[in-house]
């Protein structure tokens, strides 16, 4: 089961603890993962910094953990970013990678960009992708499935 949470104004920081309510609505679910794309991933990381014992893993898509240092938290993490991401540039990603949990699985999608983790069109200032939107989503979905299973 996957649950997508609609954020107010599409901004995760306006409701980054929404997962607590969702977990209460599904008490039979024992293995929770949390994640997000871009700022959604950043605020999933903020949430995990406080509630890490509630989760099996953290999934970051074109995202960083610049607000919280998760390196000492006992949780596994998956980070996927495109090599052509123009929003979370590689130097920024590498600078904040040290904040991610030690149990980190990382993939850099050759030719992938920031916008292609979704189907919302291209963001201003994003890089030029060398793969299709569908190829990037399929790559990410496969890696997430492997990570969870």
Predicted features, each with a name:
Residues 8-29, 34, 46:
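Alpha/beta-hydrolase active-site loop
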Residues 32-41, 82:
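Conserved alpha/beta-hydrolase "nucleophile elbow" surrounding the catalytic nucleophile
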Residues 88-98:
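Short alpha-helix in the alpha/beta-hydrolase fold that links the catalytic acid
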């Amino acid at each position: 089961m996957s649950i997508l949470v609609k954020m107010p104004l599409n901004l995760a920081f306006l409701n980054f603890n929404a997962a607590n309510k969702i977990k209460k609505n599904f008490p039979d679910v024992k293995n929770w993962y949390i994640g997000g794309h871009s700022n959604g991933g950043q605020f999933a990381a903020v949430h995990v910094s406080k509630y890490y014992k509630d989760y099996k893993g953290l999934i970051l898509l074109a995202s960083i953990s610049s607000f919280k240092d998760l390196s000492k938290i006992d949780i596994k993490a998956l980070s996927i970013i495109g090599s052509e991401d123009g929003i979370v540039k590689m130097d920024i990603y590498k600078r904040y990678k040290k904040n991610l949990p030690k149990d980190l699985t990382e993939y850099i999608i050759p030719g992938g960009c920031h916008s292609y983790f979704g189907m919302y069109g291209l963001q201003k200032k994003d890089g030029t992708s060398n793969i299709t939107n569908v190829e990037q989503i399929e790559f990410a979905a496969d890696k997430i499935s492997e990570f969870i299973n």
